[in-house]
Amino acid sequence: QDNITLCGASAYEKKFYFNQDFNALPDHVKKELQIMCVLYTEDVGGILTLEFDENGRLQFKTEALEADARYDEIGSGLKIKQLQQDKKELLESLEMYYKVFFLGDIPDEELKKKADTVED
């Protein structure tokens, strides 16, 4: 199964893309994703996309044109690590949202609650 793109930004086209399949996300979350992606591409260059893999994990994918002297590959890796730390709660929430609404997974806590109510 192919990865599902959540959003992305391009330093070349100066554009932000948001997958409308995720339109049910709160506006403040969409705005935060836009700011995060656009600032990344303005800082490092290239193209950044956030994609869900088949297990529901959010992946940061980067690419750059070969002729892009401005693109900083080392800076890119560091910036992604920083974003993954700074935005940890947001990213984990997005993964949970995807797993529940797109993959049909029920979180362990919910299963435990259901099991507890059955036993009562």
Segment roles from a protein language model:
Residues Q1-D43:
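Negatively charged, low-complexity tracts enriched in Asp/Glu with abundant Ser/Thr
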